[in-house]
Amino acid sequence: MSEQIFEKLKELLSTQNADFRAVSHASAKTSAEVAVARGTELGQGAKALVCVVKGGGAKRYVLAVLPADYKADLQLITQALGGTRASLASPDEVMRLTDCVFGSVPPFSFHEELELIADPSLLTRYAELAFNAGLLDRSIILNTKDYERIARPRLVKFAMAE
């Protein structure tokens, strides 16, 4: 768990004049539980999945961000990135690329090997996004337009309503 990532995010958002607030809450195991703890809607949650896309003898890492009430279609990620197969990264790969444990990964990439993509639905449904910020008991609630402006994710349609 990464206090450093939490502080790095707060510093980035502050220097970029983002409209955000940090929230402390009890650790939660699911997106639904953390939404209740934050006092936000489930769909406001920005779920960040570290994926491995293989193909053509290469391996790429992708941070795929989608609404917490949607599920990721790994085949669509594979197609969009020109791979032959995509899977979720191992816990060790997640830690190496994000400095975070699974479940606490924020929707920002601070690693050169980790390409950031987001499903367009993430940016259109709510005025604010909520996400774990490097720690399972801390979240940031951020203006959606500020997220798009600062993170600048590549938009890829890969999420489906559950």
Protein language model regions, located:
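Extended, low-hydrophobicity, polar/charged segments
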Residues: 1-162
